[in-house]
Structures are given as structure tokens and as C-alpha cells.
From Swiss-Prot:
GO terms for molecular function: glucoside transmembrane transporter activity; sugar transmembrane transporter activity. The chain crosses the membrane at residues 3-23, 42-62, 68-88, 96-116, 129-149, 160-180, 186-206. Interacts with TRPV2; the interaction probably occurs intracellularly and depends on TRPV2 N-glycosylation. The keyword Transport applies. This is Sugar transporter SWEET1. The gene is SLC50A1. It comes from the Eukaryota. GO terms for biological process: carbohydrate transport; hexose transmembrane transport.
């Protein structure tokens, strides 16, 4: 029993540490925006999608009474909100960004209205919300597949981040174990694609080393 309790604590701690580490990766973008007072080379859409993901899992955790989900996604949502506000501040073309943000808020309001008004049964609400969060998280993990196809076509991994790949693997594996321990299929299944795509990236790093890319470009110049 003590061993099981220690293992649970280890998994819970890993989920918190690795996930918050993933969320704080945006701090480098925030620092870049503040130093350059611009949004050059900073993508806005990942901030929005991660915000939706955080708020969805936060609602799921609150409905389920899961403290780990609540803490992690509260911090994550706060960080994404900070990144979004900073982007809005430094972005010269605010109209498009404001439209995307307003669309996000509209979708969130519709979602909350549906789950809390049209699904009165708490158990059914939990299952439907869990399914939504799971599908959304899976789509986020699978969305970079276009980049992986580009790597294969160009035989270059310059567009991939090795540290981010490691962080994604550790985070996904931690949440898979967390979902397995809680027997929660929504948490477990939604994070499995993160493990798969991480191993695909590792294979691509092995197949097309970045050092090889640098040598190739040096020869071309």
C-alpha cells in the first residue's frame, strides 16, 4: 500500500512538473515580444488552442473534483491568458487577432451553455465533457503531423525542437499513467498520441540529424 501511495505521488508530481514546464515554454515567446516589442516569429493560434484545452480540462477537473487537473490547468490557463494579452498588445494588426479571440470566447460560451444548461445530469455531463476534452487534446497532438511530413520531404529536422519533443513525451507518458491509475479513459487515451508522435519525432531526429543539416547547408554555401 505504501509502495502504491509512493508511486501515485510520483506520478502526480511528474504530471504537475512536466506539464507546467510545457506551459512555461511560452515564456520565451513572451520575453521575445517584450524585448523586440513585436510578434515576429511568434504564432498566436497555439496560445488560443492551448487556452481552450486548459479551460476544458479545468472544467472537467472541477466537475470530477480532481485537484491535480484543477491546479495544473488553472496555472496553464493563466499563462495562456498572459501570452494572449501580450500578443494583443504588441501585434500591429489587432483586428484579426481580436476576431480570433472573440470567436474563441463565443465558442467557450456556447460550450458552457450546452454542458451546464442542456445536460443537467452530472454523470452525463462529465462523460460528454471528458469526450470533448479528449478529442480536442488528440487533435492538438496530431496537428503537427504536417510538419512531420515536411521533415520527410525536405529530409531536414530544423523545424523540430528536440527539447520540446522530450517534454512532450514525458508529459504525455505521465498523464497516461495518471489516467491509468485513476481508470479514466479520457485522460489516458487523449495523451497516448503524444507518446506516439514523440517517438516518430525521435526517429526523424535519428534519420535526419540536425548536425547533418548544418553540414549540408555549409557545403551549399
Amino acid at each position: 500500500m505504501e509502495a502504491g501511495g509512493f508511486l501515485d505521488s510520483l506520478i502526480y508530481g511528474a504530471c504537475v512538473v512536466f506539464t507546467l514546464g510545457m506551459f512555461s515554454a511560452g515564456l520565451s515567446d513572451l520575453r521575445h515580444m517584450r524585448m523586440t516589442r513585436s510578434v515576429d516569429n511568434v504564432q498566436f493560434l497555439p496560445f488560443l488552442t492551448t487556452e481552450v484545452n486548459n479551460l476544458g480540462w479545468l472544467s472537467y477537473g472541477a466537475l470530477k473534483g480532481d485537484g491535480i487537473l484543477i491546479v495544473v490547468n488553472t496555472v496553464g490557463a493563466a499563462l495562456q491568458t498572459l501570452y494572449i494579452l501580450a500578443y494583443l498588445h504588441y501585434c500591429p494588426r489587432k483586428r484579426v487577432v481580436l476576431l480570433q479571440t472573440a470567436t474563441l470566447l463565443g465558442v467557450l460560451l456556447l460550450g458552457y451553455g450546452y454542458f451546464w444548461l442542456l445536460v443537467p445530469n452530472p454523470e452525463a455531463r462529465l462523460q460528454q465533457l471528458g469526450l470533448f476534452c479528449s478529442v480536442f487534446t488528440i487533435s492538438m497532438y496530431l496537428s503537427p503531423l504536417a510538419d512531420l511530413a515536411k521533415v520527410i520531404q525536405t529530409k531536414s529536422t530544423q523545424c523540430l525542437s528536440y527539447p520540446l519533443t522530450i517534454a512532450t513525451l514525458l508529459t504525455s507518458a505521465s498523464w497516461c499513467l495518471y489516467g491509468f491509475r485513476l481508470r479514466d479513459p479520457y485522460i489516458m487515451v487523449s495523451n497516448f498520441p503524444g507518446i506516439v508522435t514523440s517517438f516518430i519525432r525521435f526517429w526523424l531526429f535519428w534519420k535526419y540529424p540536425q548536425e547533418q543539416d548544418r553540414n549540408y547547408w555549409l557545403l551549399q554555401t
